[in-house]
Amino acid sequence: MMVIRPVERSDVSALMQLASKTGGGLTSLPANEATLSARIERAIKTWQGELPKSEQGYVFVLEDSETGTVAGICAIEVAVGLNDPWYNYRVGTLVHASKELNVYNALPTLFLSNDHTGSSELCTLFLDPEWRKEGNGYLLSKSRFMFMAAFRDKFNDKVVAEMRGVIDEHGYSPFWQSLGKRFFSMDFSRADFLCGTGQKAFIAELMPKHPIYTHFLSQEAQDVIGQVHPQTAPARAVLEKEGFRYRNYIDIFDGGPTLECDIDRVRAIRKSRLVEVAEGQPAQGDFPACLVANENYHHFRVVLVRTDPATERLILTAAQLDALKCHAGDRVRLVRLCAEEKTA
């Protein structure tokens, strides 16, 4: 059975294996053991209540409960940009016009922005390619909404998610090549690694401070503004079905879109509800896949089950109860996947 649980110190080698499969561009999952160990420690200290809000971040893994295999990772940053500035480009417009010459030009322009400072962030979503089946991607991505719904007071009113931009298999980013490299004088992979390992001072030091007309970029770079890496397209679709939207903010490195949503408008958060759980044999029928989560902050668990999403009393097997760290009579959080999201 596939289960979402909080990360543990012993997961570092599994996270290293996942990091080696990302293909680059996933800044928050670098193949660097010291960085990943520090990330795990920060998550553990967050759960233990030892960090200020500006440093808090939760990390979860997707585990096969039978074999112990870690198949994926996802995370939530509680409030971005309160320690180090959190940069985006806002894609806006500058108008240059002359009535005398009968000239009017509305020019797409990139403005350096810290507009998302303080927002909660969905990040570090990666599922091992071998496990991209049977609804695992939905479970991994949406489990975070179950945690946010259960512990709403831990998070801020706006949630953002940076989507990986267009990068080829050799680490070539058209957006970086045309813009970032001119200011940072390094390859995309180097900048990506520095950022992923926490060495972010260079961003503030070297970032272009003035608006940039996109027409000055290569056509290839212009074409990828706000576009996602092909492997990231499913993750974008999942978030958009939950209510997230692209509001013209992009990543400063690869030009990928930043999606955002008010936390209380996220579908899975808004529609999830608490039901009593009982042990038994679940009813047979053509039921939709539903996320089921416990309400245990320190031992949080989420699984995917097929059941009636309108039920008031959820029947689970002993194995499912064990996976959820629940007992008969406990209350669990339940929400169905979107109707079009198939798990088989």
Swiss-Prot record:
Q: Which reaction does it catalyse?
A: succinyl-CoA + L-arginine = N(2)-succinyl-L-arginine + CoA + H(+)
Q: Name one GO biological process term.
A: arginine catabolic process to glutamate
Give the EC number(s) listed in the UniProt record.
Answer: 2.3.1.109
Q: Which UniProt keywords apply?
A: Acyltransferase, Arginine metabolism, Transferase
Does the keyword Transcription regulation belong to this entry?
A: no
A GO term for molecular function: arginine N-succinyltransferase activity
Q: State the superkingdom.
A: Bacteria
User: What is an example of a Pfam family matching this protein?
Assistant: AstA
Q: Where is the active site?
A: 229 (proton donor)
Q: Does the keyword ATP-binding apply?
A: no
Binding locations of succinyl-CoA: 125
**Pathway field:** Amino-acid degradation; L-arginine degradation via AST pathway; L-glutamate and succinate from L-arginine: step 1/5
Q: Which HAMAP family match?
A: AstA (MF_01171)
What NCBIfam families does this protein map onto?
arg_catab_AOST (TIGR03243), arg_catab_AstA (TIGR03244), PRK10456.1 (NF007770)
- Its family? Belongs to the arginine N-succinyltransferase family.
- Tell me the function of this protein: Catalyzes the transfer of succinyl-CoA to arginine to produce N(2)-succinylarginine.
Instruction: Report what the protein is called.
Output: Arginine N-succinyltransferase
Q: Which organism is it from?
A: Escherichia coli O17:K52:H18 (strain UMN026 / ExPEC)
This chain is encoded by the gene named astA
